[in-house]
């Protein structure tokens, strides 16, 4: 008996994607990684992608450069105009994330979806440890952080797969 088989990846349908992946809560990042057969590694990479997404929400610098070249003149009795425009843009993220944890993980087809959120309270602790801020600034940041974390907890209670 001789068998030939052809395998293909299951098609990812939008109805299968977790609700929290489409409309992720504030202070959360989404990681999606195509499985390679080793769940531990796949999970780690998906979490890393989620942290990268989260860091991009917190601090992103956009550097752009536009080069414009224009030339005009006359060649063999004919006028000519030449324009060239180039645009280069780079998004840079550099953030230290204290207390980010994966709060939801779901495998859909060949993809690992991970929701990585700031752990309630950890951001507040990190702010409290900042020495560069005066006492009033730290207190105000802690208050805002507490409010944001309470909103996050409330949102997470209402999120289902």
Question: Which residue ranges define each predicted feature?
Answer:
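Domain-level marker for long, solvent-exposed, non-transmembrane regions
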Residues: 6-161
């Amino acid at each position: 008996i001789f068998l030939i088989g052809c395998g293909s990846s299951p098609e990812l349908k939008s109805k299968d994607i977790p609700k929290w992946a489409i409309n992720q809560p504030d202070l959360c990042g989404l990681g999606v990684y195509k499985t390679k057969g080793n769940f531990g590694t796949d999970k780690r990479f998906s979490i890393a992608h989620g942290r990268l997404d989260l860091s991009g929400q917190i601090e992103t610098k956009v550097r752009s450069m536009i080069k414009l070249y224009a030339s005009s003149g006359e060649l063999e009795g004919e006028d000519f105009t030449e324009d060239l425009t180039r645009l280069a843009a780079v998004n840079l993220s550099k953030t230290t994330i204290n207390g980010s944890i994966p709060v939801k993980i779901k495998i859909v087809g060949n993809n690992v979806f991970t929701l990585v959120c700031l752990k309630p309270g950890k951001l507040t602790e990190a702010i409290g440890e900042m020495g560069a801020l005066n006492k009033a600034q730290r207190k105000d940041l802690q208050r805002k952080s507490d409010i944001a974390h309470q909103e996050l907890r409330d949102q997470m209670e209402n999120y289902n797969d």
